[in-house]
Regions:
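Extracellular glycan-interacting surfaces
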Residues: 1-133
Length: 133
């Protein structure tokens, strides 16, 4: 679960929640979207930024359920906070990340490399993949 300044995890089906402490682990303090890798629940992706609209954003990845995070290198600096992410249900290595102000980045290798989609949109709030497309 993501709130403005923290990410929480639960190991008991949501009965209790524990903060993972992003202030000491993330390069920017504002937490936004989360996505889980469809074939490995230990791998999570997160979007962050300076503030809600922010002039800066990052995509982060953890491979140990949030204990450690790495910043993934995007081809250009996003124009705003990375607002959300979407993992493809049929291709676990395919991920979309998008900024609040319309930039879209795609990875076909689980976040190892990214390319920016040429077309930009207005404010993007969410994105989903259809499993058979």
């Amino acid at each position: 679960m993501s709130t403005a300044r923290e990410v929480f995890s639960s190991v008991d089906q949501g009965e209790t929640w524990e903060a993972i402490g992003i202030k000491s682990r993330w390069p920017l303090p504002y937490a936004r979207g989360l996505a889980v890798k469809s074939d490995n629940p230990d791998v999570l992706y997160a979007g962050c930024g300076e503030t809600t609209t922010g002039m800066n954003g990052h995509v982060l990845r953890t491979t140990d359920y949030g204990a450690n995070w790495e910043t993934l290198k995007l081809p250009v600096q996003p124009n705003a906070t990375i607002w959300g992410l979407s993992t493809h249900p049929a291709d676990a290595n395919r991920i979309l990340a998008f900024s609040l102000f319309g930039e879209v980045y795609m990875s076909d290798d689980a976040g190892e490399s990214w390319h920016k989609i040429e077309r930009e949109f207005g404010e993007i709030r969410t994105a989903v993949w259809l499993p058979n497309l």
